[in-house]
């Protein structure tokens, strides 16, 4: 009798789980929760020569957590004449074991005067937008220091 009840319980549990899978239900904990990763003591940094700039390079777009829509990224507040073509991290890019992904955001840095420029890397899923600072160092010798 106990084994019949146990079998009936298992069958009803399997039927309920199958029904939820068929209607596409996801647990509340699977809601999109992502973070644009920031390391304040070690911001992303690139160095360029003032006369050459860097016509095509990338900043990392480090996303941690879970997302179910595309997260777009771009860099703003760049030195004059510079631009960003942006980048994206798609839901399928997500590493389920690590719950993170590092995408790439394109930038082209124009020749610009020597100095240190603080730009802003932003990421958005269309609802939430997050930002972190990135540093562009412009100097004659990027290998010195």
Task: Describe the role of every protein-language-model region.
Residues 2-7, 14, 18-145:
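Long beta-sheet-rich domains in secretory-pathway and surface-associated proteins
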């Amino acid at each position: 009798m106990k084994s019949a009840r146990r079998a009936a319980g298992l069958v009803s549990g399997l039927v309920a789980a199958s029904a939820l899978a068929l209607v596409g239900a996801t647990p509340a904990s699977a809601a999109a929760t992502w973070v644009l990763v920031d390391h304040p003591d070690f911001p992303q940094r690139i160095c360029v020569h003032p006369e050459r700039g860097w016509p095509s390079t990338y900043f990392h777009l480090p996303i941690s957590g879970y997302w179910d829509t595309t997260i777009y990224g771009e860099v703003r507040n760049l030195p004059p004449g510079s631009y960003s073509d942006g980048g994206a991290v798609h839901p399928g890019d997500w590493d389920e074991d690590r719950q993170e992904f590092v995408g790439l955001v394109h930038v082209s840095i124009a020749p610009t005067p020597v100095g240190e420029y603080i730009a802003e890397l932003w990421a958005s899923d269309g609802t939430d937008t997050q930002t972190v600072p990135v540093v562009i160092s412009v100097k004659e010798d990027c290998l010195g220091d």
